[in-house]
Amino acid sequence: SPSLLATENWDAPIIVTTNVQFFESLYACRTSRCRKLHNICNSVVILDEAQMLPVEFLHPILDVLQSLQASFKASILFTTATLPVFSGRIGTGPEAFDGLKTPVTEITSVHDNLFEAFKRVELHWPEPGTTTNFDELADELSGYDRVLCIVNTRKDARELYRRMPEGTLHLSRMMCSAHIMEVIKLIKQKLKDNEPVRVISTQLVEAGVDIDFPVVYRAFAGLDSIIQAAGRCNREGKLNHVGKLGQVFVFNLENTLLRGLMGKGAAALREILSVSDGSDLFSPECMAQYFSLFYSNCNTFDKANIKGLLYKGFAEMHFMFATAAEKFRLIDDKDSVSILVGYGDGATLLEEL
């Protein structure tokens, strides 16, 4: 059909796709995935939630974006409340690399009065060295009629949810997508009707989920996660109309050890808070400082060695395109399998089988 052909060829004025589809197509070696790339020429590429670009592939991602701008004459627009540092020297170790050569510029002027005008929340930081356990946290959350609490792991979400009053809603990737969407729809309806609603969630609500709570609790994590969580609080500015601000409480969960990139982000934020009272963390300067510290803690920005595969044999014009295409996987799903879940229509289909 014409619509299917346009989807495969990106032969339309506006194309909506995912980061995975976009970047994996740019590094693909099969004709079926490459035939659409010429349509990127002279286009505007809008990357929503740019902070979600995977750090482990940041080097090849920024390289290909630079090529799109320089050779394809494309314009790249990053949209995010927490813009990472994509230009200059990124990282400090042997994996450090030079980011975008073309400077990233704001499309609007940034002034202190603009930040003041958009101030919608008040951040409350935990006292240094203090922690809270699940029981204490559940008691505190139960004191609110409408509250969102975001924790770092599915296990933490489950443990906290078990201690909450009846009627509390739970969100995590332990649920199938259909169930998640149904719960999000229910949350939005309850908020719209001004009904009591308490939600325990993992960070899946921090990007692309348009919900607005007067109070948000967030387990300690990286600054980008804290700010994204704050974006679910007084999102529409309704409290400002009555002279109030949304309340965001950051807490240290007892006996929690953050690993991987989440742990590196938390370490970078702790370093900033050691010399700051946390009142100016929404500023671009503080965000740049955070990402500089975060990247300095990272071990790799090209875990599949895509640069080596494509440039090692440059002098002999020997490029390992097929291997690079195989290894450039933003989501490693080679060992994954699809399953039919007995939820919603899935239950009916299982009965028919």
PLM regions and their residue ranges:
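C-terminal helicase lobe and adjacent C-terminal extensions/tails of nucleic-acid helicase motors
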Residues: Q69, D135-Y144, I150, K155, ...
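Loop/turn-to-beta-strand initiation segments
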Residues: D11-I15, V20, C41-V44, S71-L77, ...
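SF2 helicase catalytic motif II
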Residues: N19-F23, T31-S71
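Conserved H-loop
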Residues: A74, A81-P84, N152, Q203
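SF2 helicase motor core recognition
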Residues: S25, A157-R158, V197-F213, Q228-E236
